[in-house]
Amino acid sequence: MGKAAGASLHPWAYLASFGMSGFSLGLTTCINTLIFLSRGLSLSLFSLAIGLNFITVMALEMPSGIAGDLWGRKRVWMISRVMTLASLACYAFGNVPVVLLGCVLSGAGIAFSSGTLDALYMERWMYERGENALGKAQMWYSAVQYSSMGIGSLVGGILSGFSLWGIPYNGNLVTAFVLTAAALIWIGFLVPEDIPHREKSQNSAPPMRQMLEQGKQALAAARKSPVLMVCLIGAVVMGFTTSGIELYWQPHLETLAENWEIGFLLGLLSFAGMAAVVLGSVVSGKLSTLVKTEQGRIRIYLAARLAMALVMITAALWLRLPAFCLLYTLYYLVMGCQDTMDAMLLQSNALDEMRGTLMSVQSFALRLGGLVSQLLSAAVLAFLGIPVLWLLLAAVFLLGSSFCGIYYRSRAGNVHKK
């Protein structure tokens, strides 16, 4: 890994942008379905819209990370914000076809933001403050991102009661537009440009060939690193498992709530989950300063996954509302620990010129696991209930995480012998 050039850290500049983006996202995600239905979409068209968004993200996830490594992460991230602005405009003023176009643009914005500014932030933090400080970098990133999303969701719920220009939910959308534009301008002026790998290597090959070559090199580098392979395999397992929690906790809560006000519980638990992720990130960041060996961090990573699986099993078997609320919060607390340690392991083992590419590959693996899980979960739920599904997913999580641990021990042993 070579020294980053021309790159002062300025963490507050990055974190302020992450905060604005997270707040903007929270303003709309809390009423996402309602926005689409108010624009004339039926429930079937809403499903199509979500599908278009998901397919776009999947298709562009890896190319966007490669593009950031080759042609500049700041540049590609700014393109992602322009796409997000266009999608918000489509949602605010469009009819059904324009809203569907907005879903495609939103998916492109999500994909192009992955492995770009976040990769640049982690890289510059590592070079200015050392590899052992990566846990703190991820802690701050998660804390700002999730807390701003949580606050944005609360504010979004309040704004949703007001219409702008007689159009429902435009207060949320216009506020999100202003914050996204502010983040774009903020980063444009305050974060230094990064030197693209294409300029460092003076590669004159056609862009598509450069992207294919970059992807091949990143995958080859991952195959040589036991830690990177654990991160990528673990991402597939994580996506497969967590999608079952994220998609089905709300209907499960509804069955347990009985006479409780479900809207209040949904809002309270959503906020509690985000707060728990922040707290888990803080705990993991502190642990990373105490445990400085790769093997020790792998153990924490695997222990957090074991704890997540045990919480899932308990939540599936203990069918009481107070217990579920506690276990749901605990699940996200441990997930925050896992996410921070996972990010630290990947960042400390990724080459600079492939950092964004590997982050996008990991994100793609996470989404791929989630897609497969959604297809299989639908079949399981046709015959069995949500608790049984969670037990099956927990079993897969335990097996997959155990495989990651065995794989690391065998590969790391071979590497050390060489």
Locations of the language-model features?
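Short amphipathic helix-loop junctions that connect adjacent transmembrane helices
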Residues: 30-45, 247-264
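A membrane-interface helix-boundary motif in multi-pass transporters
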Residues: 161-178, 260-267, 296, 379-397
